[in-house]
UniProtKB/Swiss-Prot annotation:
Sequence positions that bind Zn(2+): 101, 128, 131
Domain (CMP/dCMP-type deaminase): residue spans on this chain: 47-167, 186-296
Reaction it catalyzes: cytidine + H2O + H(+) = uridine + NH4(+); 2'-deoxycytidine + H2O + H(+) = 2'-deoxyuridine + NH4(+)
Details of cofactor binding: Binds 1 zinc ion.
Entry binding sites for substrate: 88-90
A GO term from the CC aspect: cytosol
UniProt cross-references to NCBIfam families, sorted A to Z: PRK09027.1
Gene name, Swiss-Prot/TrEMBL: cdd
The protein's name: Cytidine deaminase
Enzyme class, UniProt record, top EC level: hydrolase
Pfam families listed in its UniProt record: dCMP_cyt_deam_1, dCMP_cyt_deam_2
């Protein structure tokens, strides 16, 4: 079991703790599939909602909050039945807008894993306005059920009435819809090829700044992030932050980064290079490779 979960395990009911320990091996990064979840439910004899709330300390152990020292975990449950954990991240010395909220982390985890619909968000405190707006960008976002301790489950529309969202800006394929922009570049570099794939799947209906980030560690592992825009603009999730969140979930130190690539479309009305460089340089002494691609 990874050391970062030692304190969290102590907070779980004993039957659940015993059942989940085998999952928390060196490769665990916050994903529990539907079959594993069913096995945890059977072993713990807990109702599903009770079980998901009980797992929040495990999600919170994924957090990296050097500024606030406040660990927040969230869980997104997809239509597949799989659950995806996420946690907050803060970048040392950088402005707070560089932070990743736990709900953003969990949703991006599900998105990167191929989920097309998120049905439930489980979190230990009421989602802030920023996160409510981010959830509202999803396919059927207003219908996403929010689960909180000691409160009745309610859809996002209860927490964000009279919401402003993608439909108000004539966007008919919101976040988690299948996106496929064709971005090509003649390259045999595996990192660039991976980045092109993710940039093509990014979500940027408002600026057309389709983009992705790929981070490589010294052992050759890669971690990706895609741009995820928001109708309210400010809650948009940057690809660098998503990639760093992915690294954190996989228990990798940012000091292990030895290469970083940002790929973005030439047709975007904005560029993400400045924001990506600031975020990267707060955690790693690595130059950002910036590649601008003509979309087909």
């Amino acid at each position: 079991m990874q050391d970062r979960f030692l304190k969290s395990i102590a907070k779980l009911p004993e039957p659940l703790a015993t059942a989940i320990v085998p999952l928390l091996d060196k490769d665990f990064a916050g994903h529990i599939d539907a079959q594993q979840l069913a096995e945890l439910q059977a072993a713990s004899k807990m109702e599903l909602n009770e079980l998901l709330l009980a797992l929040l300390p495990i999600a919170a152990a994924l957090a990296r909050p050097p500024i606030s020292q406040f660990h927040v975990g969230a869980i997104a449950k997809g239509k597949s039945g799989d659950i995806y954990m996420g946690a907050n991240i803060e970048l040392p010395g950088e402005a707070l807008f560089h932070s990743v909220h736990a709900e953003q982390s969990a949703i991006s985890h599900a998105w990167l894993s191929g989920e097309s619909i998120i049905e439930d968000i489980i979190v230990n405190a009421s989602p802030c306005g920023h996160c409510r707006q981010f959830i509202n960008e999803l396919v059927d976002g207003g219908k996403v059920n929010i689960h909180l301790p000691d409160q009745a489950t309610a859809p996002l529309s209860h927490y964000l009435p009279y919401a402003f969202g993608p439909s108000d800006l004539d966007v008919t394929e919101p976040l988690l819809s299948k996106q496929q922009q064709t971005l090509t570049l003649d390259s045999n570099d595996p990192m660039i090829i991976e980045g092109l794939d993710h940039a093509g799947l990014s979500y940027a209906p408002y600026t057309k700044a389709y983009a992705s980030v790929v981070l490589e560690t010294k052992d050759g592992a890669t971690y990706c992030g895609r741009y995820a825009e928001n109708a309210a603009f400010n809650p948009s999730m940057q690809p660098m932050q998503m990639a760093l969140s992915t690294m954190a979930r996989h228990n990798r130190d940012f000091s292990e980064i030895n290469r970083a690539v940002l790929i973005e479309s030439s047709k975007g009305v904005i560029s993400l290079v400045g924001a990506a460089m600031d975020a990267l340089h707060s955690v790693a002494a690595v130059e950002l490779e910036h590649i601008v691609v003509e979309p087909e």
